[in-house]
């Protein structure tokens, strides 16, 4: 086999691989010898079929198998021998001339193919001890814990039917039918819907008009959907709702005690407080982690500047661009609405894609040199988390990870990255700084000052800058529920 380098520009490589016809013939003969005793051909005793006849019957199919095996296995072998790592799967090109291909299958012509790929650049690791990051820490006040417990208690409170008029804080049970221009619309009907007046779950003006109703009342109210309502056919439209009040119930007093904790499956109010405090700490800890990681990656980005594989950047950019356009479409906006142009946005997100790829390669190299490993147990926990997020789809998810090339790597990658970040944080200077909740949740100054206003969901695309995403964009208030158009989907 002969390997000839025909292109070496930057990270791009192209190789011509030539396997002589006589070598292909030898391989085919070896394969024919292996099958000679196993094949059954009419007119011949087992093991007595002449090689020439075997070649006539099976030669081309065996040669096709050999070609496929060579194309499958040789690229890795060749790159390993050259001390190179391909950024993506090498592109293999063979002759498209049928006559030439037929000669190859008959071992009458050399088998030639080309490999086109980009190498992963050699990365010389730099001293990271000069990196300094600030870890913002929030001291959780007792009042905040109590407020959260109060919200939990409110969500778990009971209601008792009452006679008389509904007031704010009461729960009404209603049937309703929504109409625009006298015609019922999709999602505008529900039965036995429970609504706490004053909760602002429904669109503006809906709940206010139910104050004062009694069980058995029938009433038609008129409301106007917000101009930015996600359902375009309803946005800004005036609608009527025919309402039948089936029950009015008053809320029982809120009591935060062991009985409440027992209802929630806990042994005591103290345990409830402990869990709530832990949840708040976890929420703030997640934001702290994101901001520390962003600082770390920003400084790594300044330390490392090298050419990135174009194919990796293209693939990353396409992922970002697809998400950006999806977010714009869902928001009903254009690039012009965000004070930018498509061309400018493409340039911005192209830079982001390059940064993602570059930092990914750097973290990979650091992790490899540091011996960072992702254990089977960690992979299993990650898989179980995926299953937990999609109840009822466990089999499909398991099949996907079992049968899809690269699926397991998609589970491993974020785990590996977080462990590399942990490794780096153990080496760099980390200074704790006590801040308020508002200070912790504030956007980074750098993100508040883009060259131009970023397109919709800039933060969504910027997630890889910190590995973990910043806080998700707030849901649209008064979004239509799948079943109840009047209901706020963010309930």
UniProtKB/Swiss-Prot annotation:
This is Trigger factor. It is found in: Cytoplasm. Residues 169-254 form the PPIase FKBP-type domain. It catalyses: [protein]-peptidylproline (omega=180) = [protein]-peptidylproline (omega=0). Consists of 3 domains; the N-terminus binds the ribosome, the middle domain has PPIase activity, while the C-terminus has intrinsic chaperone activity on its own. Residues 433-491 are annotated as: Disordered. Its EC number is 5.2.1.8. Involved in protein export. Acts as a chaperone by maintaining the newly synthesized protein in an open conformation. Functions as a peptidyl-prolyl cis-trans isomerase. GO terms for molecular function: peptidyl-prolyl cis-trans isomerase activity; protein folding chaperone; ribosome binding. Coiled coil: none annotated. NCBIfam families: tig. GO terms for cellular component: cytoplasm. Keywords: Cell cycle, Cell division, Chaperone, Cytoplasm, Isomerase, Rotamase. It is an enzyme of class 5 (isomerase). Residues 452-461 have a biased composition (Basic residues). The keyword Thylakoid does not apply. It comes from the Bacteria. Signal peptide: none annotated. HAMAP family: Trigger_factor_Tig. GO terms for biological process: 'de novo' cotranslational protein folding; cell division; chaperone-mediated protein folding; protein transport; protein unfolding. The gene is tig. Belongs to the FKBP-type PPIase family. Tig subfamily.
């Amino acid at each position: 086999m002969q390997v000839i380098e025909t292109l070496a520009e930057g990270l791009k490589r192209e190789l011509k691989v030539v396997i002589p016809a006589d070598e292909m013939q030898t391989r085919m003969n070896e394969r024919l010898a292996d099958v000679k005793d196993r094949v059954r051909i009419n007119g011949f005793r087992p093991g007595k079929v002449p090689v020439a006849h075997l070649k006539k019957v099976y030669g081309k199919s065996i040669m096709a198998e050999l070609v496929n095996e060579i194309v499958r296995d040789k690229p890795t072998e060749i790159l390993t021998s050259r001390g190179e790592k391909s950024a993506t799967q090498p592109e293999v090109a063979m002759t498209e001339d049928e006559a030439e291909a037929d000669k190859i299958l008959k071992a009458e012509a050399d088998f030639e193919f080309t490999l086109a790929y980009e190498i992963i650049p050699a990365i010389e690791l730099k001293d990271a001890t000069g990196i300094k990051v600030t870890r913002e820490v929030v001291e959780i006040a007792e009042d905040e814990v109590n407020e959260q417990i109060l919200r939990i208690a409110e969500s778990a409170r009971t209601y008792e039917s009452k006679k008389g008029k509904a007031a704010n804080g009461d729960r009404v049970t209603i049937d309703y039918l929504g109409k625009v221009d006298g015609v019922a619309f999709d999602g505008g009907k529900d039965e036995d819907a429970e609504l706490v007046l004053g909760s602002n779950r429904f669109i503006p003006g809906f709940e206010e008009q139910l104050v004062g109703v009694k069980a058995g009342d029938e009433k038609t109210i008129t409301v106007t959907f917000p101009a930015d309502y996600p359902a375009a056919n309803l946005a800004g439209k005036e609608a009527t709702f025919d309402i039948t009040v089936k029950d009015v119930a008053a809320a029982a007093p809120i009591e935060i005690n062991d009985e409440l904790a027992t209802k929630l499956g806990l042994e005591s109010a103290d345990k409830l407080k402990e869990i709530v405090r832990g949840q708040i700490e976890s929420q703030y800890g997640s934001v702290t982690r994101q901001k520390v990681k962003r600082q770390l990656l920003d400084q790594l980005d300044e330390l490392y500047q090298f050419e990135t594989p174009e194919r990796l950047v293209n693939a990353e950019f396409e992922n970002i661009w697809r998400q950006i356009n999806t977010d714009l479409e869902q928001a009903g906006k254009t690039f012009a609405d965000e004070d930018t142009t498509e061309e400018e946005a493409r340039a911005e997100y192209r830079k982001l894609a390059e940064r993602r790829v570059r930092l990914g390669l750097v973290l990979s190299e650091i992790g490899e040199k540091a011996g960072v490993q992702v254990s089977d147990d960690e992979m299993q926990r990650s898989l179980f988390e995926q299953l937990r997020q999609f109840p009822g789809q466990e089999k499909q998810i398991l099949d996907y990870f079992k049968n899809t090339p690269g699926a397991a790597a998609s589970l491993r990658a974020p785990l590996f990255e977080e462990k590399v970040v942990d490794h780096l944080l153990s080496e760099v200077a980390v200074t704790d700084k006590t801040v308020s909740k508002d200070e912790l949740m504030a956007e980074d100054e750098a993100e508040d000052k883009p060259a131009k206003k970023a397109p919709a969901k800039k933060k969504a695309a910027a997630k890889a800058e910190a590995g973990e995403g910043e806080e998700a964009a707030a849901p649209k208030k008064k979004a239509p529920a799948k079943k109840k158009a009047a209901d706020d989907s963010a309930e």
